[in-house]
Curated annotation (Swiss-Prot):
It is a multi-pass membrane protein. This is Cobalamin biosynthesis protein CbiB. It is found in: Cell membrane. The gene is cbiB. GO terms for molecular function: ABC-type vitamin B12 transporter activity; threonine-phosphate decarboxylase activity. GO terms for cellular component: plasma membrane. GO terms for biological process: cobalamin biosynthetic process. It holds the Pfam family CobD_Cbib.
Length: 319
């Protein structure tokens, strides 16, 4: 039944994704973070106090998320096993973001093909932290491909990884870790102190999933009739060409599979950041690379699900 719940949740995400106006745990987690952050900022003046308060905030948000998820699931199972199973499917479904990521990326294909830079820049500003006001089509394509490649890890592979380790409650706790990083894990002045622990713990949580993504995306490249060997080679060579210890693993693998170059300099919050290049520019990046990256994401996602199901069955057999 547990494996069936995983499969149904994955299929639901593949087919419908997150309906825009449905209640979603990540929104509730976001409200909790905002509430706790307000308290921390009120009672923790100074950088040192904010770093400690940010650590307490991380423990509270992740702990509450895991505890509530575990409690709701336990209560639902006591009401009726089938009701508990349905709640488990729903919880797992909400931790996956493949369809939402694919939809967000596909939103750029039409305006880019029509050379509507104004619409493309506005839409890109909704999903990335860099300055998009002066970006050209190739830079927008690059940003979208990078977003899909990076979020293949924290939107699909990592939730499945923590689902395998600790069930739906641990997968929900991972979403809290990831949401904390998304909201406060920045290096600029406002969040540097309070978000330090959140940023570091997100790096820890994604350490193994990011490295697993290198292998899965490399295999996916071969299945998508792209260069699997080049994906794995470039993915390994450029795995540390990023300020994050995790992001370049998936981005470099995708860059290698497609034969394009990612990364490079960008403007963030008014400051130019010179990032190293990822991959080799064997050709110019194009709008078609967005759909190719989405395809890689889905194949890698399927491989991840199959891997964790096989591991679960193997462990059950040993037990």
């Amino acid at each position: 039944m547990t494996i069936l719940a995983w499969c149904i949740a994955w299929v639901l995400d593949f087919i419908i994704g997150d309906p825009q106006h449905w209640p979603h745990p990540v929104r509730w987690i976001g409200r909790l973070i905002t509430f706790v952050q307000r308290i921390v900022r009120r009672y923790c003046p100074g950088d040192k106090a904010l770093r400690i308060g940010g650590g307490v905030m991380w423990v509270v948000v992740v702990g509450v998320t895991w505890g509530v998820a575990w409690g709701v699931l336990a209560l639902a199972q006591r009401i009726h096993p089938w009701f508990g199973w349905s709640v488990e499917v729903w919880m797992i479904f909400t931790t996956l973001a493949g369809r939402s990521l694919a939809r967000a990326a596909q939103e750029f294909e039409r305006p880019l093909r029509e050379n509507d830079l104004a619409e493309s820049r506005i839409k890109l500003s909704w999903i990335v932290g860099r300055d998009t006001s002066q970006l050209q089509p190739a830079q927008i394509n690059r940003a979208v491909v990078e977003t899909v490649a990076e979020n293949t890890v924290d939107g699909i592979i990592a939730p499945l990884f923590f689902l395998f380790l600790g069930g739906a409650p641990l997968a929900m706790a991972y979403k809290a870790v990831n949401t904390l990083d998304s909201m406060v894990g920045y290096k600029h002045e406002k969040y540097r102190a309070i978000g330090m622990v959140s940023a570091r713990m997100d790096d820890v949580a994604n350490y193994l999933p990011a490295r697993l993504s290198w292998l899965l995306l490399g295999i996916a490249a071969g299945l998508c009739r792209l260069s699997d060997w080049r994906a794995l080679r470039i993915g390994w060579r450029d795995r540390y060409n990023h300020s994050s210890p995790n992001c370049a693993w998936s981005e470099a693998c995708v860059a290698g599979a497609l034969g394009i170059q990612l990364g490079g300099p960008n403007n963030y919050f008014g400051e130019r950041v010179d990032k190293p290049w990822i991959g080799d520019a064997q050709r110019g990046i194009s709008v078609d690379d967005i759909s190719r990256t989405i395809r890689l994401m889905w194949v890698a996602s399927t491989l991840a699900l199959a891997l964790f199901i096989a591991a679960r069955c193997g462990l059950s057999g040993v037990a």
